[in-house]
Amino acid sequence: DVEQTPIVIDISKAVLEWLPDTVDTLSTSPQNSLVMLVDRDTSYMYVYRFYNDGREDLFQAWTKWQLPGTIQIAEILNNDVTVISQHEDQYTLGAIKLDELPSGDVVSTSSSYTGDVPLDMVTRPVKPHSSVDAVVYDETNDITKIYVPYTPIDSKDAVMLLTVPTADDGTAAELDSDQGYWAKAIERTETSTNYRYFEVKGKFTDYADGIVVGYGYDLEVTLPKFYFQRQGAGADYTAALTIGKVKLAVGRTGAIRFKLRPTGSNEWKDVQHTIEAGVYQGDTSPVVNEQIFALPIHQRNTNFELKVTSDFPYPVSLV
């Protein structure tokens, strides 16, 4: 009943039916105000985090993480979520930083990189054999083959992201690195050699010194329902409220999308937003420290759901 006053309770109680009974590992980090539940032998983790100013909890949220492989074990060590996962016949050790937002600036070395890339299982290209380059262009099919040190996951697309090569960092050539450009990378197998690689449309051998490849994080956040609230008073759940426009301020963030679903519908539709005028330096990762998005809604507050999504290889900070 949309006219009934909502029952407002602690968020940790509201998710009891959302958490599966197969969760078998728990890890905590008091200094990060975080609890992590792990469903081993699946790809899912459930993270609860809150912020307390010393008097009360000002922010609390549950999030569900899906990793590319099957989780064998996951623990919080210092400020990292350290995960051992399995895919195909291989095991991967990975670390996800909790308190350092990626700036978008990444510099590639010959075999690694510096900076935080918002991709999972991210790696520089690696030669499959001493006689084969790590990045090869197939002129006949107009594709670039990118070889990696692990076996790509079957039927799962990855992301190729351009960064700044070490030799170009801080020089005029940095502008030619096209930092922040990305393209879909499709897993493939060579029939003649059985080498596994990622395929990207177009020629990228000129950017080989700055290429990194990994799997993207698909972000999806459904925003809570809006209610009328008088200054200094609680929300009035019975008041009639029409939402004309929603303005959403985000922290260090790249591109994001917004989707709206009418109440009772199963279809999410894109909402075309507007942003305040601003600039960022050309040929750099399109990440700014703060951005404000304005969304035209023109709906009763009980007539729609609104969510934020992103499948781009850039950081997103909604807090």
Please report, for each region that a protein language model flagged, where it lies by residue.
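Beta-sheet repeat architectures centered on beta-propellers
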Residues: D1-V319
